[in-house]
Amino acid sequence: MTKLATICYIDNGCELLLMHRNKKPNDVHEGKWISVGGKLEKGESPDECARREIFEETHLIVKQMDFKGIITFPDFTPGHDWYTYVFKVRDFEGRLISDKDSREGTLEWVPYNQVLTKPTWEGDYEIFKWILDDAPFFSAKFVYQEQKLVDKHVIFYEK
């Protein structure tokens, strides 16, 4: 079965907004520091999903964002191949949701030089580097087995 989702990196110029997934029961991401995002709803475009998920999880309103790439995660959850649209947001407004109102985890602005020190999925360290380095548009595939990265490849598309 196919699952479509967005991954959204929010950048304030010196930090990325990450979520420490520490609130949701039976969460595949439990304990990890990840970007915000989520599953596309019926009839929703990736752009609409990204904007909705960012608002729901952070209360920030996206003014402009860049479509950075697509990542495939075959069989990431049992029986589900995940296809994720990756966005980077630099232009936003609003006030960050309070910790008590956040349902999935604790949000934190993480300085660029500390992003790679946070515990997360092995492949996410690669994505963090691409986002921080403003890499060209990419198509990637990360294969996990029992939460371990066992294969990966990426193609960057130069402008």
Curated annotation (Swiss-Prot):
Output one GO MF annotation: metal ion binding
Please report, in chain numbering, the residue ranges of the motif Nudix box: 38-59
Q: Which residues bind Mg(2+)?
A: 38, 53, 56-57
> What are the Nudix hydrolase domain coordinates in residue numbering?
1-133
Which GO BP terms sit in this record? DNA repair; DNA replication
In UniProt terms, what function does this protein have? Involved in the DNA repair system to avoid A.T to G.C transversions. Degrades 8-oxo-dGTP to the monophosphate, but is also active on all of the nucleoside triphosphates.
Q: Which family does it belong to?
A: Belongs to the Nudix hydrolase family.
Kindly provide the name given to this protein in its UniProt entry.
Answer: 8-oxo-dGTP diphosphatase
Q: Which organism encodes this protein?
A: Streptococcus mutans serotype c (strain ATCC 700610 / UA159)
The gene behind this protein is: mutX
